[in-house]
Each structure stands twice: as C-alpha cells, then as structure tokens.
Design a protein with these regions (language model features):
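Amphipathic alpha-helical segments
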Residues: 25-64, 68, 221-262, 266
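Structural preference for solvent-exposed beta-strand-turn elements
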Residues: 35, 73-82, 271, 280, ...
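A short glycine-rich beta-alpha junction/loop motif
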Residues: 2, 14-34, 171-177, 208-229
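A short beta-sheet element
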Residues: 1-3, 113, 139-197
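Short, solvent-exposed loop/turn positions at domain surfaces
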Residues: 15, 98-99, 136-137, 167, ...
C-alpha cells in the first residue's frame, strides 16, 4: 500500500543535511482501506508477481554462475602450463590520460573512460562508444588492437582493476585511471583469464574498502596467470566465447521478462491500491488482474 504512495511520501521530505519526514506527515497520509477479505486478495495477486520476478532473477543469477564456473574450471592453473606474471609478457605498460565527462563528443577520436570498463564493456570489445577531440587531451595515450585495458579506480575491492581486451582496428585514446597492457599473446584469452576468480583475488589483494578503491601499475604487473601456447590460448578463447554467446542468447529474454513483470506488478499494485470503489466493483477488477497474471 505505502509503495503506491511513494511519490506523495517523497513530497513530505524536508531538505536538510539528513533528509527526513515528520511524524505528523506520515500519520496524516490517507490510504484506501478495503475490507480484510479484499486486502487478502490484493496481497495474493501482488505476491504472485513478486514471486515470479524473484524466480526469474534467480535463474539469471544461476546462468551467470554456471558460465563463471565453466570459465574458472577451464582456466585454472594446470600441471604443464607455466604461470607467468603480467610484467613478463608485457611489451609495454602505461597509464592513460584524463578525459572528462564533458569532453566526450558525438564524433572525433574513439576513446574509453575508466568507468565504461565497468558499465559498458564485457570481456572484449571492438568499437568504442565514446569519442573526444584531440585538443581536449594534453598528453594523449593510445591503445590499439589486442591491448588489454585495466580500470584502476573503482567503487569496490571485489571489482577493482576490471580488465577488457580491445579487438577493434581503430587507434583509440585511453582515459585517466586506465592502464594499457601491450603484449604478443591472444587478447581474448588474456581477457578471459583475467576475469577468473583466481585473477580477481590477486587484483583485490591488499586493497582497503573505502568510497573509492585504487590500484596501480606495479600491482597489475604482479598478477600471475597460466599461459599455454598461442594455439591453446585460441582454443580456450573460442570455447569461452561460444559458451558466453550461448548464455547471452539465453539471457537476453530474462532481463526483459523481469522488467516487464516488474512494470506489470507496479501497474496492478497502483491500480488495486488506489480504488475508492465498493468491494463488489473492486472484486471485478481483482478478477481481471488474476486472469492477466495467469495469461
């Protein structure tokens, strides 16, 4: 009931260093109160929506964990495969240079800002979503095909130094708080192996929880990974790309279904909880809602 009044409740908030609502405002809030029998029927319908949304969310989480388990099992350290530090395979490693949010343009030189590594790109990518003008960057730092990008600033210890591989063919600018790793290995393999739990634990080692978490080039260089021959790297990368594509195809419908069910829940919640009609009229509305849910 109170969820349907969220906008009205928000209007009661007093602007202060700590936003608050007075007791009088809450006690003065008017709500529709149908009979207990009707209340039970409303709750039953709305609970059905929330239960279905929870089931869909759990399925989406399970598929993600399934992929991560398969990836981590395939790329775990094995006898006969050497473990190397990233500094041993780096032909160059350097930091990008700051590109501010207001310096991003619709056209210009392709670029990546560190936050996009967390929010926009997955394991690897071939096209930049952002551009900037060269005159905006005092000390331009570029990345090219095959380079690995690390975001060395983040909001959580668990996700710090998330990395992605660039497999496009344009020369692009790396923003600040990004480390660029150049190498002669398979970039897709490196991207997959650097996303494993074993690699993430190394990335977060020694980091302290705070509002902003930082990493650096020396920490990146010390990360150890299994490094098979190039032909094996390609086989692993192809297998993981294929499995990831299958999981992604299966998952495309789930987020959309979850969003649709959430909107459906909100619609019927607001509809059912704002009626000022008689119980018999409301019963007809409830019956329609039940039929819609079953459909």
């Amino acid at each position: 009931m109170l969820k349907s009044k969220q906008n009205k409740i928000n209007a009661f908030v007093r602007n202060a260093s700590i936003p608050r609502i007075s007791k009088e405002s809450i006690l003065g809030l008017k709500v529709s109160l149908p009979s207990v029998e009707v209340q039970k029927r409303i709750v039953k319908i709305l609970d059905s929506f929330t239960e279905l949304t929870a089931e869909l969310t759990a399925e989406l989480t399970a598929r993600k964990k399934q992929y991560e388990f398969y990836r981590d099992s395939l790329l775990r350290p094995k006898e006969g495969i050497p473990m190397v530090e990233l500094k041993d395979i780096a032909t160059d490693i350097y930091r990008g240079f700051g590109i501010k949010r207001d310096q991003v343009t619709a056209n210009g030189i392709p670029c990546v800002r560190y936050g996009e590594i967390y929010t926009t790109y997955n394991t690897w990518f071939d096209t930049c979503v952002s551009h900037t003008c060269l005159e905006n960057v005092a000390n331009p730092k570029y990345f090219e095909h095959g380079d690995i990008l690390f975001a060395i600033t983040g909001e959580s210890v668990e996700d710090i130094a998330k990395s992605v591989a660039y497999v496009g063919h344009e020369k692009c600018l790396a923003g600040g708080d990004i480390v660029v790793l150049k190498h002669k290995q398979n970039p897709r393999y490196l991207a997959h192996v650097l996303a494993t739990q074993q690699a993430r634990e190394q990335k977060s080692k020694g980091k302290v929880k705070s509002k902003v978490v930082h990493s650096n080039v020396p920490s990146i260089e010390k990360i150890r990974i299994p490094l098979p021959p190039l032909d094996v790297q390609k086989r692993y990368a192809d297998a993981l790309d294929n499995f990831d594509a299958i999981c992604s195809d299966l998952n495309i419908g789930l987020p959309a279904e979850i969003e649709a069910r959430q909107k459906q829940y909100e619609y019927y919640r607001d509809l059912l909880l704002t009626f000022a009609e008689t119980g018999s009229t409301l019963a007809c509305k409830l019956q329609a809602a039940s039929c819609k849910l079953q459909a």
